[in-house]
């Protein structure tokens, strides 16, 4: 199989090297061909928060290095603020032009091992009539030594279905050329005993900016986390959970 890996990144150097390590190993030694396309982009909501177009950490420098060393087959830099799906569509068009069989979307705080990737693709290969697959994550939060279960987003999408994969119309949401929304197509969840992927998500180290972004995007009460300005740390937004009648997540210690 030929796999197209796509991602959009901005100010994400904290876990970037760890994120791409498994993919670099797979590209060099894996059973299947991997075509990688990343785009550097600052989301539109961040423009309203005063963020510059260019990252102020080492993200762009690292992307440049991955491209020059051959891990990235395509690397684009957006010269304007794009929504996530608009940025990812740049990457999607790149990998589709390379004739990939599946498109795999990732966030650059998701840490797949070589074994995770290999086992997931074996599962995909065993289910050729399935159009898309969800992946289970361990969402590491706060100090990074505890995690939350239950996050299982769509990640892998078959290209040769419904006239071909066309584009993203929202963050992780695809439509096919015949107008079929991927949600209407057959899907499977990759079982946890095959892969339960490490996701360095809502942490004290990155939480303040994420809360500000989510509030700008979803409204003042639209984020399940809050930033405690007195203690300078991330906390659960209890008002959000009460308002939506959602129990607070269970924290699992490492």
Regions found by a protein language model. Name each.
Residues 2-3, 32-36, 72-73, 101-103, ...:
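Residue-level recognition of the N-termini of beta-strands and the immediately preceding loop/turn
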Residues 3-15, 19, 26, 39:
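A conserved hydrophobic helix/loop-capping motif in glycosyltransferases and polysaccharide synthases
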Residues 13-16, 79-84, 111:
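Acidic-and-aromatic substrate-binding clefts and catalytic sites of carbohydrate-active enzymes
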Residues 21-33, 41-51:
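Short, acidic, metal-binding catalytic loop of nucleotide-sugar glycosyltransferases
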Residues 24, 28, 96-97, 125:
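Residue-level signal for alpha-helix termini/capping positions
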Residues 38-100:
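Active-site-proximal specificity loops/subdomain of glycosyltransferases
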Residues 84-89, 111-254:
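Catalytic-site signature of metal-activated, phosphate-bearing donor transferases
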Residues 99-113:
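Short beta-strand-to-loop acidic/aromatic patch adjacent to the donor-nucleotide binding site
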């Amino acid at each position: 199989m030929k796999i197209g890996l796509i991602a959009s990144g901005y100010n994400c150097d904290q876990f970037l090297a760890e994120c791409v390590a498994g993919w670099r190993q797979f590209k060099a030694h894996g059973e299947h061909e991997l075509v990688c396309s990343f785009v550097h982009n600052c989301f539109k909501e961040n423009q309203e928060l005063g963020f510059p177009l260019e990252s102020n950490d080492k993200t762009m420098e690292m992307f440049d290095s991955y491209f020059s060393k051959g891990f990235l087959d395509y690397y684009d830099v957006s010269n304007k603020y794009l929504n996530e799906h608009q940025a990812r569509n740049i990457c999607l068009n790149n990998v589709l032009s390379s004739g990939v069989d599946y498109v795999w979307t990732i966030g650059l705080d998701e840490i797949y091992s070589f074994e995770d990737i290999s086992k997931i693709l074996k599962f995909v290969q065993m289910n050729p009539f399935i159009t898309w697959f969800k992946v289970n994550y361990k969402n590491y939060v706060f100090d990074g030594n505890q995690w939350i279960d239950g996050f299982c987003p769509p990640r892998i999408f078959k290209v040769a279905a419904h006239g071909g994969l066309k584009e993203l119309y929202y963050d992780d949401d695809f439509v096919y050329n015949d107008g079929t929304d991927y949600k209407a197509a057959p899907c499977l969840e990759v079982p946890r005993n095959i892969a339960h992927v490490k996701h360095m998500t809502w942490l004290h180290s990155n939480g303040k900016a994420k809360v500000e972004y989510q509030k700008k995007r979803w409204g003042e009460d639209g984020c399940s986390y809050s930033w405690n300005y007195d203690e300078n740390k991330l906390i659960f937004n209890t008002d959000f959970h009460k308002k939506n009648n959602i129990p607070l997540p269970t924290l699992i210690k490492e």
